[in-house]
From Swiss-Prot:
GO terms for biological process: proton transmembrane transport. It comes from the Bacteria. A possible function for this protein is to guide the assembly of the membrane sector of the ATPase enzyme complex. This is ATP synthase protein I. The chain crosses the membrane at residues 16-36, 44-64, 77-97, 105-125. The lineage of its organism: Bacteria, Pseudomonadati, Pseudomonadota, Gammaproteobacteria, Vibrionales.
Length: 129
């Protein structure tokens, strides 16, 4: 029963991650074809940074469910958000320091996926009752 309470949230997070991943692949392929492969690679890295960090947050956020686990739920959300920020910083550091990436597509794709993360949940609202 308790696991069933978190199932809708997990499903929503999974759908959102799939939309984000698809958008990253689509934009990276488009930039690779339209501009050059370096831009496509950089776009893939930029969007991938966001998707990986968001996936870690989703795993932490929906680890617990139920009224008895309220403190653990709050702690897992906080832990997930901290990990998301740390992973984002670490992956951007690795991208800047150790990879030959173009900054414009890297940041544009990151911001695109961030926008999807903000706007896409509206698509999942179901007002039919």
């Amino acid at each position: 029963m308790v696991a069933a309470l978190a199932r809708p949230g997990r499903e929503l997070a999974r759908q959102l991650l799939m939309i984000q991943s698809g958008a990253v692949i689509f934009v990276a392929a488009g930039m690779a074809v339209a501009i050059n492969p370096d831009w496509g690679f950089s776009a893939l890295i930029g969007g991938g940074i966001f998707v990986v960090a968001n996936a870690v947050f989703a795993l932490c956020a929906f680890m617990f469910s139920g009224a008895r686990a309220a403190k653990r739920i709050a702690a897992s959300f906080y832990t997930g958000e901290v990990l998301k920020i740390l992973i984002t910083v670490a992956l951007f550091y690795v991208a800047y320091m150790y990879m030959q990436v173009e900054l414009v597509p890297l940041k544009l794709t990151y911001l695109l996926v961030l926008g999807i993360n903000i706007c896409a949940p509206v698509l999942f609202i179901n007002n039919k009752k």
